[in-house]
Amino acid sequence: MPHSAYIFDFDGTLVDSMPYVAMGVKSFLKSRGVDYPENIMEIVTPLGYPGSADYYNEHFGLSTNGEEYLEYVQNLIYKYYQNEVPLKPGVYEYLTALKARGASLAILTASPLRFVRPCFERLGVLNLFDHVWSCDDFSMTKSNPEIYLKAAERFALAPDQIAFFDDSIHSLTAAKAAGLFTVGIYDETAKAFVEQMTKTADVFLEDFRNIDHI
């Protein structure tokens, strides 16, 4: 049944940006001479930029920090968010339908908001959102159930009145623990977790087409 509010992840959920993010991550690691595993994006995506830098230092012997890493990746891929990154199939139609029926919408992302706003302005959807939140606004990651409870407070709603969409098993697990209705979204970079997401999320979808029942 329809909910009162909807929270969406950004990268890999609403926009098909993960190939660009992966390019930036792998370029950074190559520039440091790191022989990274094939599933590096599955490992670091839930960590955010500071957490990813910590992971590289611990596992690859680097001595980088989150700001240095963020600056490198941002400078490399920012232009793609401004000019190329597209919405995933059915996203525009779904978001406009939600607003038409009076739902409140929010973004909750580990990505810098300087990526989100110009991308959504270009795609014509920024004005559909009541809130655009970064994890930094809550001082915690999306792997922490508390962040969803704090978001619910900002909506002045109970958690079970909110639907949450993400392509990350870690975020979906945390949101479900917080009591939100969870919707897993397929993304190529997270395909190894499809079985887990199908079991964990209340609903798992290939894309946003024909989902007006949620």
Predicted regions and their residues:
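Conserved SAM-binding loop
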Residues: 14, 87, 105, 140, ...
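Short, flexible loop segments at the rims of nucleotide/cofactor-binding pockets, characterized by
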Residues: 81-86, 110, 182-184
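Asp-based, Mg2+/Mn2+-dependent phosphohydrolase catalytic module
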Residues: 1-4, 96-99, 113, 117-214
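Short "lid" loop at the C-terminus of a central beta-strand within the Rossmann-like core
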Residues: 46, 112-113
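N-terminal helical cap/lid subdomain that shapes the substrate entry/recognition surface
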Residues: 2-97, 101
